[in-house]
Amino acid sequence: MEPSPSSPPSSPPEILDLDSIKALKILGKGATGTVFLAHDVVSTSSSSSPFAVKLVPKSSASSLRRARWEIEVLRRLSVDSNQNPFLPRLLASFESPEYFAWAVPYCSGGDLNVLLHRQNDGVFSSSVIRFYVAEIVCALEHLHTMGIAYRDLKPENILIQQSGHVTLTDFDLSRSLKKPLRPHFYQPDPELIIDRKKSRSFSRLISPTAEKNKTGLKKTRSARVNPINRRKTSFSSGERSNSFVGTDEYVSPEVIRGDGHDFAVDWWALGVLTYEMMYGETPFKGKSKKETFRNVLMKEPEFAGKPNDLTDLIRRLLVKDPNRRLGCHRGAAEIKELAFFAGVRWDLLTEVLRPPFIPLRDDGELTVGGFDIREHFEKLRTTPSSAPPSPLRSPPHVCRKNDPFIEF
């Protein structure tokens, strides 16, 4: 059973009134949009409670389609009678001829990637991993029962709430499947498919062995380009005819091969994520995208020391055959039964009073004033920037190098 939400289900989302809100700062810029920390300057009841506003320009048919889908997913999560505490809700949304904008609760703890790298040794202890993975499992389980495959699980997309619990974010790459309770394989639509002939050509190029990955902490790259043919994407039409979605170090073998994929891709990504939390690096990272994909297809994850319940969980999640992967038959129920989660009260996860990390409150930033989001958007449109986009949701003030964890 999934944990009960800490508050009753919200009412249907409202229309976002950009005239009544001001942005306090930019939380992050990405390839598809900008995220602002904002507050309501009109309503006294909400002016002290900041929220995040994501603004996505309608620059292409692809961005328009993904923005609409993300808003739709958030809307479904918000009106769900069994709202999940580890998934966001849509506060309000707005559409203009130039852009989409929507508001979600602000997560003051930043993302899991920043938190992981701030640790002295760059890794989490087993108890901390258990805490975060348990909540992520519940979030994925909820999405899967709704018929949604997440398909973009990575530390950067796991936000830390003020309470210390997690929230998944960014649903533009998710996919609705037809049979939520008994997942079946499907063939991706033309935008997401890898040409099978090129996939076979790529398979002939890879060698049967892979070098040991001794690289340091990663900086993820989105695998939204064709790994076989490096031709530039045509953004004029908004179509990417030979592409697939995900982040290269987290992409599952069946996606690389161009096979149909289902909910099992999320359990594979959970295995990669858990490995990274344990060792500070992903298990298949290579010196290039091609080598990374070769490792995903051919290499087995390497573990230090003796096998234990945690490594058993990771091994089962990183089975390359999706039909034998942990979670492929009964979903999250199979994962919850493993010895690593022995003693976990799945229905009481939100009742843990002291999560491993509790963000410092930044109430000092919640002052009157701010800037107009629309004016900032117009400046971005008219002023080209040579600087690369900064990672989303990684505010530098969130946590410091020696922020301690509270074990539970």
From Swiss-Prot:
Q: Which SMART domains match?
A: S_TKc (SM00220)
**Pfam families, alphabetically?**
Pkinase
Report if keyword ATP-binding is assigned.
yes
Under the GO molecular function aspect, what terms does this record hold?
ATP binding; kinase activity; protein serine kinase activity; protein serine/threonine kinase activity
**Tissue specificity statement from the Swiss-Prot or TrEMBL entry:** Expressed in the epidermis and cortex of the transition zone of the root apex. Expressed in rosette leaves, stems, flowers and siliques.
Alphabetic keyword roster:
ATP-binding, Cytoplasm, Kinase, Nucleotide-binding, Nucleus, Phosphoprotein, Serine/threonine-protein kinase, Transferase
Q: Which domain of life is it from?
A: Eukaryota
Task: Output the Gene Ontology cellular-component terms.
Answer: cytoplasm; nucleus
Please indicate if the UniProt record lists Cytoplasm as a keyword.
Answer: yes
Residues of the Protein kinase domain:
21-341
Q: Where is the AGC-kinase C-terminal domain?
A: 342-408
What reactions does this protein catalyze? L-seryl-[protein] + ATP = O-phospho-L-seryl-[protein] + ADP + H(+); L-threonyl-[protein] + ATP = O-phospho-L-threonyl-[protein] + ADP + H(+)
Enzyme Commission number(s) from the entry: 2.7.11.1
Name the InterPro entries for this protein: AGC-kinase_C, Kinase-like_dom_sf, Prot_kinase_dom, Protein_kinase_ATP_BS, Ser/Thr_kinase_AS
- Per the record, the major location class is cytoplasm
Q: Where in the cell is it found?
A: Cytoplasm; Nucleus
Q: Where is the active site?
A: D152 (proton acceptor)
Q: Which residues take part in binding ATP?
A: L27, G28, K29, G30, A31, T32, G33, T34, V35, K54
Functionally, this protein is described as follows: Regulates planar ovule integument development.
Family, according to the entry, reads as follows: Belongs to the protein kinase superfamily. AGC Ser/Thr protein kinase family.
Q: What is this protein called?
A: Serine/threonine-protein kinase UCNL
